[in-house]
Amino acid sequence: MREAAAALVPPPAFAVTPAAAMEEPPPPPPPPPPPPEPETESEPECCLAARQEGTLGDSACKSPESDLEDFSDETNTENLYGTSPPSTPRQMKRMSTKHQRNNVGRPASRSNLKEKMNAPNQPPHKDTGKTVENVEEYSYKQEKKIRAALRTTERDRKKNVQCSFMLDSVGGSLPKKSIPDVDLNKPYLSLGCSNAKLPVSVPMPIARPARQTSRTDCPADRLKFFETLRLLLKLTSVSKKKDREQRGQENTSGFWLNRSNELIWLELQAWHAGRTINDQDFFLYTARQAIPDIINEILTFKVDYGSFAFVRDRAGFNGTSVEGQCKATPGTKIVGYSTHHEHLQRQRVSFEQVKRIMELLEYIEALYPSLQALQKDYEKYAAKDFQDRVQALCLWLNITKDLNQKLRIMGTVLGIKNLSDIGWPVFEIPSPRPSKGNEPEYEGDDTEGELKELESSTDESEEEQISDPRVPEIRQPIDNSFDIQSRDCISKKLERLESEDDSLGWGAPDWSTEAGFSRHCLTSIYRPFVDKALKQMGLRKLILRLHKLMDGSLQRARIALVKNDRPVEFSEFPDPMWGSDYVQLSRTPPSSEEKCSAVSWEELKAMDLPSFEPAFLVLCRVLLNVIHECLKLRLEQRPAGEPSLLSIKQLVRECKEVLKGGLLMKQYYQFMLQEVLEDLEKPDCNIDAFEEDLHKMLMVYFDYMRSWIQMLQQLPQASHSLKNLLEEEWNFTKEITHYIRGGEAQAGKLFCDIAGMLLKSTGSFLEFGLQESCAEFWTSADDSSASDEIRRSVIEISRALKELFHEARERASKALGFAKMLRKDLEIAAEFRLSAPVRDLLDVLKSKQYVKVQIPGLENLQMFVPDTLAEEKSIILQLLNAAAGKDCSKDSDDVLIDAYLLLTKHGDRARDSEDSWGTWEAQPVKVVPQVETVDTLRSMQVDNLLLVVMQSAHLTIQRKAFQQSIEGLMTLCQEQTSSQPVIAKALQQLKNDALELCNRISNAIDRVDHMFTSEFDAEVDESESVTLQQYYREAMIQGYNFGFEYHKEVVRLMSGEFRQKIGDKYISFARKWMNYVLTKCESGRGTRPRWATQGFDFLQAIEPAFISALPEDDFLSLQALMNECIGHVIGKPHSPVTGLYLAIHRNSPRPMKVPRCHSDPPNPHLIIPTPEGFSTRSMPSDARSHGSPAAAAAAAAAAVAASRPSPSGGDSVLPKSISSAHDTRGSSVPENDRLASIAAELQFRSLSRHSSPTEERDEPAYPRGDSSGSTRRSWELRTLISQSKDTASKLGPIEAIQKSVRLFEEKRYREMRRKNIIGQVCDTPKSYDNVMHVGLRKVTFKWQRGNKIGEGQYGKVYTCISVDTGELMAMKEIRFQPNDHKTIKETADELKIFEGIKHPNLVRYFGVELHREEMYIFMEYCDEGTLEEVSRLGLQEHVIRLYSKQITIAINVLHEHGIVHRDIKGANIFLTSSGLIKLGDFGCSVKLKNNAQTMPGEVNSTLGTAAYMAPEVITRAKGEGHGRAADIWSLGCVVIEMVTGKRPWHEYEHNFQIMYKVGMGHKPPIPERLSPEGKDFLSHCLESDPKMRWTASQLLDHSFVKVCTDEE
């Protein structure tokens, strides 16, 4: 050990020579804490025994004084050299404590002893009796101390006998050694300096005496002042002279300290060796004469394999003969075995010789007290070449020992006994670390016990490194240059280490087949271990434990084996972040200290040392083989038949687990070998069998998924959680398939097939349900001919049809949502066809400064990127991964939008084209992608040029920009497709399946129509026909609503030519519905019926591109049909019943209107306000009697269509003249005005809550029809649907003047109030009371506590019942310390806010009960939970309106009482069983000082929830504070929560993100599915400026909250 001697050197303060210690008298009691002297640290047993004998036995012969002197001298000397030093920490601590105790007590005892011994010679004293008594007491105490010391000595002797291995072997008992005589000034041969080199002590300069002055004439206080001043000045300034004196003293003291340390080291060496100091000095001097020869031997060291031939011919490794080994493995090549055996013998011989040379190095280092002294005497030792060689030897020796030990541990864990028989490079060497915790003794085959013991031993072995203080641990990537001959000999013959084709030796690659071993049993030796481990702990825990055991050793060996230190390209190795739940691969770059400790492998080459690469490769391969065996086991355990629905979920989970674990270990294996082996593709070529089994497991997983979805589709409620399951499995598949060869294309095709299968099964489900319903009707009709039975049967079938359409709607909605997700993830490319020569395209690309990308080995693949990406290699590699099928949407969040890649593949089809592509002269950008990416790109078939982006949302922008830049050179083939041809074809099939479902939905509606009109009418009596027609219309409306939603959603799935196809089907379905309405539904009564809402939404959602593709005749007929349908649905007020309803009797069992169907909201009353937003009753009489001028509307419609009679009554749907409008009685608004207001309200709202957001896309131009005609038709149709009347009403001249003056005055007052020039008149008198002087209300009823229902920031909430009345309440328990005034004050503030306010929409407060350490608050109990829980899935709008009104009323009540709630959110709004909304939790509320104050800055503290905070609360409004307007902002956020089911800013996880967003002026997005009134209501709530924000009283007048609270 190099630093062992230095570690034994005591601190400078205690460096006292033994001679000085013996000469000096015993020291006085040291001040606490006393640092013990090292020489007198403990009392050895010999000394103490002698002291006992001398004190007890010879007390009569010796005088007390001589006794005392002998005791003192013997103690001082024997404490130094009487016995061995303490060897254990416990012994050191005990002796140090005892020494301190004796040091403190001994001087006092001696003084007392002397006094008592001298007492007889003194004159007699008065109290002699007391003296005698004190002497007896002292002798008793002394004997007690002696007995305790003797027992301590015996214990120390036992400890020293146990630790005798630290001493030289001396027979018999430890002899008492003589005391060496050491002199600091004596020259020693073995020490660094002699007397000639001793420094001359610098004499301390004698300070000059200060000038004496007479101080008799100075007062005492002046002298004191002068002395104090002098001392202060001396403390604050140090002279240069004093600095020089201090430096001289430090140098002198440093020299003598080193001298003392060297002498102590020499004394210790002499004591350990059993010599005198002079003999030891001469021995060291003689032994050092051989150091130059040893240094030269190390510098010229080279492994001598002279006796290697004899060893090889004599016997095989581990005592097995070569002949016997060959017999054991028939067919083995002798060359292969001899190479394996030769490598092991070379390692063994090298290890012995390196170990011997390292022992010599330790021997010469032990001859010096420190390495500095050795380097001072021998410059060769300090030379860089010598240190590099020593470092290389330490590296080789430590890693070889470590890998050998880990191979043995793995053999023990896996239950393999003869490691050499299976080709593992293991030989017998000592353990590299203490065997105490490093070689666990495993018993039996209990794998769990083995791994538990292995884990505990691994913790110790991984933390303890090879204990060699000379060499720091080496992690620097090193230029590996072994001896060429040795490397060739090893690498050519050790193919088994890198391939799976050889498991029993290191022969040629075809050795295993000649040996007669089948490929099935290559890894079968791991089968027992793998089988038991998977059952007991699972694959994840198995990987974790193996990684924990092996990773440290493998990382050290890999860093030592890397051949260069070039930076690894981005994504050259797969990012293992997705496997972080298993184990995180360590890819941290070496630190600066590790880089400084580089070892040149030229030294290893010169010393002819064998490489430890074979052991490293075997250890890496063993880990991979264990996981490979897990793969094989799962493949073999696949059930033969089709798994059941109950078991398939577990099978899928196991497949996912083994796929993830296999990919993680594959990445780990590639990471370990990627820089160790010269050929990067070599490890991949060697894991072909592993890749093949991995691909088989992926196919098994796909089969399970397909079966699982098919089983779920057969369930009656298949729509529940189906989409969530598909999304989860798709996200998992996207993560893993890129790392499996060929997995991307197969995964995309599989999930496209699954989505298509869902759409097909939805159509089949619909058809089968219709057939079943029809069969049930005829079965019941045959059984009974009674009319009531037939009527009941028709009603049941109608209900069943509504449920059928509802379930089909849910299934189709989720299938479409998943299909849109697939399209978004997979369609990331646009395809172009080259319409000009290649040279022209290259010239354009050069002029646009494009850069060519080149991948080594893929020269036939032409890739170009914009010049902005030339330096962004990471983005280029991400684009290549995206082109190969990897999901890069997560990686590309921060990537520039203009990142795209041009990709084409010329192949061998055109030689001139290949030559043209080769004319690119600019320097390409070379990148090295992942191996899987290269394989995918190599096998990819690219016929044309692809433009690839990372996210499909960026494709439209990039495609347009690229088209503009190369206009005329390329033709667009596919505006959105996949880069994989297989996936592109599957997506096209998916779109065809979606279009096919449109036809099947239309056919199903026709089938229902035919079933009721043709089949059921014949069996039903005329008296029941009216009732049955009512059920018929409900079923039909449900079917049409399903069709509306599906058609609107499927449009977003289509692109390219499919959009034209869906446009035709869209318009066809619209015609079908309008024909049904005209023929089967009654005419309206001047208002739009609710059942027509979705139909009008569907008509308005027709895209202009769909209409532009229609021929002229089709467009005119469609326009006329729409005109007639809208007029028929709206009708006229109090118009006679027409059409099919002429025969309806008044006493029909159901109302004479089309009933609401399953998809209608429950509210039967729909108030349609006028576009002006006010009631028609408030309009002037002339505005009510006059319609809008007919000329404008008639001119727009007459240009394309003539007036035609309506089918029912002959009334024209064109606008009537003004004169005819006067004759319309009871008309609040003319017909066309009402039509315009309805059309203005119509907007596209998706009924599906499960669909993804609409993606922005450009509308392709279709060849049919001219652009001018299409524009005209689109304008005419929009004018027909959304035309609104002129809002300017005709007023008289006096009324107009009055109105203008009123408006002017209001504007002037508004402006003055905005500038705070004036205020406003308030009915409430001013009050400046800061507190509400209302005492806390005490409860007077008896109560009993129930269950705990919640826990908040301030306390727990329980249910509570009043014993007197039986009323259920909520009790809030708040605990506090008896003197906790802060909590009591906060609670009192909350209670004061409660008191005095009683309102149906506020949680009621009953009273309080105050105790010593707790307070009980009794409140109203709301039994239906919170609004946050109810609105998780979103609420319908009529419910949102009702709740918004009640919340606004509650806020208004609080504001009128001068209270700001400050924490309005869904969790603080409670529901009761009666349907009421109650605002509660007033813990954050504050009572305003001035009720009548109208300024916004009323509160200056910040409280509340970040997602619901107003901007002025976050920003503090530039110091102005906030007020009641903050609650209005929170109200708007609650409305958004009710609509969407999520709180505002739900996409942000942290409050600081939300606060930053709101503070920067952003508003929560207003939901699109909200009505225009709701959007307007939110716009007034979410006004950034609190002064412009509406108050609660103003919001109560808004039309959005104009609802009747007594509705159902």
Swiss-Prot record:
**Where, per UniProt, does this protein localize?**
Cytoplasm, Perinuclear region
The EC number(s) attached to this protein equal 2.7.11.25
Segments of skewed composition (Pro residues): 24-37
Activity regulation behaviour:
N-terminal autoinhibitory domain interacts with the C-terminal kinase domain, inhibiting kinase activity, and preventing interaction with its substrate, MAP2K6. The GADD45 proteins activate the kinase by binding to the N-terminal domain. Activated by phosphorylation on Thr-1505.
What catalytic reaction does the record list? L-seryl-[protein] + ATP = O-phospho-L-seryl-[protein] + ADP + H(+); L-threonyl-[protein] + ATP = O-phospho-L-threonyl-[protein] + ADP + H(+)
Q: Does the keyword Transit peptide apply?
A: no
The biological processes this protein is annotated with in GO are: chorionic trophoblast cell differentiation; intracellular signal transduction; male germ-line sex determination; MAPK cascade; p38MAPK cascade; placenta development; positive regulation of JUN kinase activity; positive regulation of p38MAPK cascade
Print the keywords alphabetically: ATP-binding, Cytoplasm, Kinase, Magnesium, Metal-binding, Nucleotide-binding, Phosphoprotein, Serine/threonine-protein kinase, Transferase
Q: Biased-composition ranges for Basic and acidic residues?
A: 1252-1261
Residues annotated as binding ATP: 1349-1357, 1372
Q: Which SMART domains match?
A: S_TKc
List the InterPro entries.
Kinase-like_dom_sf, MAP_kinase_kinase_kinase, MEKK4_N, Prot_kinase_dom, Protein_kinase_ATP_BS, Ser/Thr_kinase_AS
Lineage: superkingdom: Eukaryota
Give the start-end ranges of region Disordered: 1-136, 429-478, 1157-1190, 1202-1231, 1244-1274
Give me the stretches of Acidic residues compositional bias. Answer: 66-76, 456-466
Q: Where is the active site?
A: 1463
Report biased composition (Polar residues) as residue ranges: 1217-1230
According to its UniProt entry, the function of this protein is described as: Component of a protein kinase signal transduction cascade. Activates the CSBP2, P38 and JNK MAPK pathways, but not the ERK pathway. Specifically phosphorylates and activates MAP2K4 and MAP2K6.
Q: How does it assemble?
A: Monomer and homodimer. Homodimerization enhances kinase activity. Interacts with TRAF4; this promotes homodimerization. Binds both upstream activators and downstream substrates in multimolecular complexes. Interacts with AXIN1 and DIXDC1; interaction with DIXDC1 prevents interaction with AXIN1. Interacts with GADD45 and MAP2K6. Interacts with ZFP36; this interaction enhances the association with SH3KBP1/CIN85. Interacts with SH3KBP1; this interaction enhances the association with ZFP36. Interacts with CDC42.
Q: What family does the Swiss-Prot or TrEMBL record give for this protein?
A: Belongs to the protein kinase superfamily. STE Ser/Thr protein kinase family. MAP kinase kinase kinase subfamily.
What is this protein's record name?
A: Mitogen-activated protein kinase kinase kinase 4
Q: Name the gene that codes for it.
A: MAP3K4
